[in-house]
Design a protein with these regions (language model features):
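A short helix->beta-strand "capping" segment at the edge of beta-propeller domains
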Residues: 1-16, 50
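WD40-repeat beta-propellers
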Residues: 43-47, 85-89, 108, 124-132
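A structural motif specific to WD40 beta-propellers
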Residues: 6-8, 52-55, 94-97
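Beta-strand-rich domains and repeat architectures in extracellular enzymes and scaffolds
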Residues: 10-41
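Conserved strand-to-loop turn within each blade of WD40 beta-propeller repeats
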Residues: 37-40, 78-82, 119-123
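Asp-box/WD-like beta-propeller blade repeats and closely related beta-sheet repeat scaffolds
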Residues: 93-115
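WD40/WD-repeat beta-propeller blade N-cap
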Residues: 11-18, 58-64, 99-105
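Loop/turn segments within WD40 beta-propeller blades
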Residues: 22-31, 67-73, 109-115
């Protein structure tokens, strides 16, 4: 049985439906984060246990369908209806990488070593640490 608190949270801020949530791993201090994909095109990073807003990743033109955050919550990835996937510095909110696709990107996932991302809905992926090389 998990010792984590299991209290439902209501997190305001999105103007359209949320379509997906992803969570970081729990760090040594017991802290974890969540990121939301939303039809408003503005994924939000939040404190996992409280739902407190940390920041919004702005740069997609259209609905964001897929999100992920790496294990230590230093990077975030987003996939959207604008045919792109993006990697963000989760600490500063700065966009680090954009991968263009031929179709809507509906899912993004960091690899277990956090070095690469896989993107669903198109056939591209990239090196999350070296600008897609």
């Amino acid at each position: 049985m998990s010792s984590l608190r299991q209290t439902p949270l209501t997190c305001s801020g999105h103007t359209r439906p949320v379509v997906f949530l992803a969570f970081s791993e729990i760090n040594s201090d017991g802290i974890y984060y969540s990121i939301s994909a939303c039809k408003d095109g503005k994924p939000m990073l939040r404190q996992g246990d409280t739902g407190d807003w940390i920041g919004t990743f702005e740069g997609h033109k259209g609905a964001v369908w897929g999100v992920d955050v790496n294990k230590d919550a230093t990077k975030a990835a987003t996939g959207a209806a604008d045919f792109s996937a993006k990697v963000w510095d989760a600490l500063s909110g700065e966009e680090e990488l954009t991968l263009q696709h031929k179709h809507i990107v509906k899912s993004v996932n960091f690899s277990n070593d956090n070095a690469c991302i896989d993107c669903g809905g198109g056939a591209a992926g990239g090196d999350a640490s070296r600008g897609g090389e």
